[in-house]
Structure formats: C-alpha cells, structure tokens
Amino acid sequence: MKNLVIIGAGGFGRELFSAAREAIGFGEQFRIKGYLDANPAALDRFAGYPPILGAPENYTPAPDDVFITALGNIASRKRCAALIEERGGTFISIIHRSASFGQNVTVGPGSFIAHNAEFCPDWH
C-alpha cells in the first residue's frame, strides 16, 4: 500500500484530501499519510485532516510515499514537484470514482480529476 502525501495544505489541499478519500484506489492502493506545507500552522483552524509532515524543501520521500500537488500557483507547483522528484519521489493521479471517461482518454501522473468530471473520447 502506498502513502499519499499532498503538497499544499491550503483550500485546494483540503479539497484534494476529501476527493482522495472517494478516489479510485483509496484504501486498496493508497492511504493518506499527510501534507507537506511550508506553514506548519496551515491546518490549525481545521479538524479532521492528517498532519503536516514538514515543508517540501525539507522532506525526504519514504519508499512507499507517492505525491500529488495541491498548489494553485503554477510556478510553486513546478518548483515543489521538482524538489520531490529530485529526491526520488513519484506522483500519482487522483481520480474521483464518479468521473466518466470516453474511449482513448489519457490522464498523466499528478493529475486531479474531480467528482462528476466528464472526458470526451480521445482526450489527452
């Protein structure tokens, strides 16, 4: 079983946490380990979330860790993903169980497909 680490504990990260618990593979292929966020107090006002494990800059991936970014800023997302990949981390996609896919759809690693999303055939 893999351990999902969500990079970013802001609003997008909390949304992704909820979606991941209803995603294909949850509880069978992965469980949620926690968050990486530079702000250790990012979740202090919220209950029911996994812990912040540290900042992306300081985290060393464990062998069973897999990652997904939940950062709205594209430059920050790319920077944090590169930091984790440089240390051997791998990214997975989170696909909500209610998503619908046509023929020949390709979803790349690190993608987040939300609930009720629909993809037409031949989408890449």
Walk through the language-model features, giving the residues of each:
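Phosphate-bearing ligand-interacting subdomains
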Residues: 40-101
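NAD(P)-binding Rossmann-fold cofactor-contacting core
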Residues: 23-46
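Structural signal for interior beta-strand "rungs" in well-ordered beta-sheet cores
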Residues: 93-124
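Glycine-rich adenosine-cofactor-binding loop
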Residues: 2-20
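Short active-site oxyanion
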Residues: 3-4, 31-33, 64-68
